[in-house]
Structure formats: C-alpha cells, structure tokens
C-alpha cells in the first residue's frame, strides 16, 4: 500500500512540474507575441541584432515585399559591409517615440548612439513598420543605416595611419624610427621565363617557390602589377662609399644587382620600422611585428587593425601605449560617382609619442663591439643620478630581421645557436664571484661582526673551519700580510671573506641582503630577475654560508641590481634607483634604499676598492689611469658540480667606476663574460673594459 501511494505521489509531482513548464514556455511565447505588437520593442529587437551582427535575424524581421532590398543576400551584404567596415560597436537607441497610423502601420522616431572607427556617432532617425495579424514588420530602407544614405550611395571609410613614435637616446640619436627598406617583387607581365624567374628569386630569398606562386595568383594581380614577395635591407650608397665597406653589404649589393638583371624582378622602396644600432641594442630596444589574431583579441577596442604592428619585445613593448598613436579616420557617404555627400564622423590622426631614454648610443655600440664574440652582458650607469647608460647582451641578433621577416634558415640559425643570441643576459641573475666581496664587507662592518683593521690571520692558500667540513676547503691565490679588509679586497682573498660570512652568521646575512633588495623586484622599467642568496628559503649549511662570503654558494645577482648596490659606495651609503625613461630631461637622482651603509663604512670599503685598481698588486690594476681615479672589483665565479670538478666553467666579472663626482662623464660599469677559464679569467674582462673606458672617458 505504501509503495502504491508513493508512486501515485510521484506521478502527481511530475504532472505539476510538466504543467508548470508548459505555463512558463507559454509565458515566453506570449511575451514574444506581445513584443511583435509593440513597434518600439520590435525596433529595439532589430537594433540588438545589429549589435550582435546577426544579419539573418534582422532580415527575418522585415516586411520583405515593401522593403527596398531585392534579396536576402543583398541585404546581408549591404548591412554587414557597412557596419563591419565602420567597426560599429556599443550600439544603443534612446528617445523612442511611436506613432500609429490609421492603416495599422507605425512610425518610430529614435536617437542612435554607436562607437565607430572614427569615434562616437549620434543621430536621430525614423523607422516605419507595417502591421498584419502576425505583428509589426520593419519596412527597410537604406536610410535606416544612416539618414542621409540612399540606395545608390556608399559608406566610405578612410584611414590615416598614425606614425609610431621614435625611441631616442640621451643625445637625441634615433634608436628606433621610420626607415627605408627594399621590397623585392615581380611584375608578371615582364617575366620572360616564369618558372626560372620564380626559382631564382626563391633561392635568393630562401623561401619556397610555391610561396611566390601563391602571391602571384592573388585576385588583384594583373600583368603590370608589382607583386611584393619579401622585404630586404636597402643598400645605401653611403655604405658603399666608406673606406672599408662591410663585406656583407658588398655581397648583398652583388646579389641584388644579379637579381635586377632578371626580367620581371624589381625593387621598390618601402617605409619600415628601423633599428639603427642593430645587434648592439636589440635585446634592449626589441622589435615590432604585425599583429596576430590573438593580439587583436587581447587588445580589442584599443585601435589595432589587421595591418597594425605591435611591440613584441624590449622597449617596443614596454612603451607600446605611448609609441603606438591613434590612426585618423573619416567615415563619409559618397554618391554613385564617388562624390562626398556628407561626413558621418571624423577622428584626426594622433601620432605616437617619442620616447627619450637615458642610454648613450655610442657607449652601447662600443660595449657591443668589444664583447660581441663573447657570451656576456654589460650594464653602465651614472652612479650619482641612476641614469642607465648602457644595457648590452652578447651575442646578439639584428632586430631589423624580425621586422622585414626571416626565412626558415635564418630563424633556425638563431634559435638553434648554442651561444643563444636571443637570450637576454642582462635581465638574468648570475653567480657574482668576488664582485660580491665588497657587499659582504659592508654588511659585516654594519652589523659589527668585525672592523676594517681586524687581522683575520694568514691561513696560507687553503683553509677550513674545522674537521666537520671533511675534505672541503676554501682556497685563495695570494699570500699576504696583514690580513685586513683593505688587503683582502686588493688581493681578492676568498678565505678572508669566507671567515667574514661566518662571523656575520646566516640569519644576519640573509636579513641584511633582504634589506638591500634581495628576493624582491628591482624598481626598474624593464623587469629583471630577482637576486637570491639561496635556491631554497635560506642559507642552510655552514659551508654554503662560507661560500656565500666570496660570491659563490647559491648567490645569484642581477648585474643592474649589483650596480645599484655599488652606487652606495659613492653616495654616502645610499643606494640609487636606476632609471631608463628620461622624463622631461631631468637628471636628478632618486634614492632606492636610504642608509644601506654608513658613510664611515663606505670610506673603509672604498679604500680597498681603490686599491684594487690603483695598487700594482690589485687584480684590476690593468684598468688604472693617470688622469681619472677609478675604483672597482674583479670577480671570477666558478661553475662546477663539486670542488674537485675540473670540467666546470668560469664567469669573469669586472665592476669599475669613476670616484670623483666632478668627473665630466661619471660612470659605473659592470661587465660579465661566460667561459673565461682559458682566456685569462677576469683579466680578460678588465682588458675589454679598459678599452671601453679609454674611449668613453677620453682625456679629461
């Protein structure tokens, strides 16, 4: 009995639910029918379909006998071309008023508001609806799109491309701007042997012949058309008139001359984004490329079109909003003869802003030329103002190739190169080796772990704290007396700084390093990797702590961060914030970390740093000058699996800076080179930096 009752109850519920569904569904139908009998709501429904681009739904609402369009296809083509051509969005109507006529028809007046490629458009308009037993149906006329539009008129959209802003160095020299390249292409009607012409051009460009064939088959191509195939560097006459023309330029010129002898092949000048320092600044400046479908989706509503370019790397993407500009646009109605009848909307062109940066283009180029065959990086800044003068990564690539387009072989050569020319080294962190010793010295003095005159004792060339270290020892290269801070810096004594780190202690060292920017983002325009003192959260062992004292262990430092720390030695212990964007030409400094060290500590550390360069026993003596006082620190970081590993590599460092605030061109320069083990260690870097400083400082 219970089962039967339960079953009956279930049936009752089911019936109720089904009946409710019928009521709800019927309710929706009733609402739809009611809307069909309200012309104002029918108009709003039609406008929603316009907003969504649902042209078939729009057509379904028409009184097809009375509307001016002959067919559904014509209607869809007319509406879609206009609305999509003007880039209509955010369409809405207000002030809707309907007047019903005696014959049942209705006239609805309203105000349209929409966004277009030329900005906001607003106008009043009228729509007429016919009426029958199924409700109101729109009598479509062309004026429903725009009041002035007749059936024979066209809506014309004219774009005026905004000029992308230039990127300029501190002296106004162009790093990125508009330049000229050569477009190589074919005039089909002038070819004598089509197959041979295409084959030779494909070989020269490093592309497939089928790719050229596809371009020649385009609908717009006629016998006398110039069909662009690729963009290549333009050979300037001035490049050929130099005393010793570049071999690659001569080879390229010879190839182009050979190509031009083939009937049907032509070169034409085209304007392209050009990077004037090429490889010397490619990692810094970056490059632009044509927008992708993903770019258009991500930056919807920001004025990008299918023919736009967008910054992909470097400063080009960092300052994209400022550099981009806004294209000009005019939307107008023209008659059948092409005469302008009226202007619907006009947005003037707004060119992109020029970006002035603190980089010295000449110094950037000089650094690149010195190190272009090495794996390394250099950063240079004014230590008093924080103006970044150079950011160089080597080996490098020509960023112009990304604008002009690369063939598969060019891309493979870059991407598969074991020296990784695409890798931006100045943004990374590296084992600093002995360049870290002044930092340990300053921290030790600050926390009172030792004084500058404390003699740590001569341990010879190898040392370990006690037998708990097993076979592990810290080694150094020079034996000297007394073992005090100044001498330890001059002779770059690993043992002294291993002891210094132990005296400071792991907790105090980690806390002190955090206070000078470790494990935090460098406040700089370009995002840099964060410096660290451990792969984990902390320094875990005594040996790791000792190794950290001379810049080994798990210490990794970003070169620009290291440069900022060194600015404290020239600014009474204040770390200066580096900057790149020369806003308004101001050169005033901004302190990043105030009182990182005291003036007394700075004085004691500086005594050793000056000795490194000016004392004949100093490891940086090779950079010593008679006219300008320099200070600095060398470093050789060992990268190997174990202490006994003989197959590891070495990173060579040299940090060098002018010490007199009144120097005409003050500079703090840090250079790092990988794999210096067999080419002189840090001495190799000292020699290179000396040549750079000789050119930059000249004879003051």
Model-derived regions, located:
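N-terminal Lys/Arg-rich, disordered targeting/topogenic segments
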Residues: 1-13
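Extracytoplasmic/periplasmic proteins that interact with beta-lactams or build/remodel peptidoglycan
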Residues: 81-377, 397-421, 429
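Beta-lactam-recognizing serine transpeptidase/beta-lactamase-like catalytic domain environment
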Residues: 334-344, 384-434, 439-671, 681
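Sec-dependent signal peptide cleavage junction
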Residues: 27-44
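Short helix-adjacent coil turns
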Residues: 46, 50-58
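Short, gly/Ser/Thr-rich active-site loops of penicillin-recognizing serine hydrolases
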Residues: 588-590, 686-700
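Short solvent-exposed beta->alpha transition segments
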Residues: 34, 41, 56-107
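Hydrophobic membrane-insertion alpha-helices, especially the h-region
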Residues: 15-29
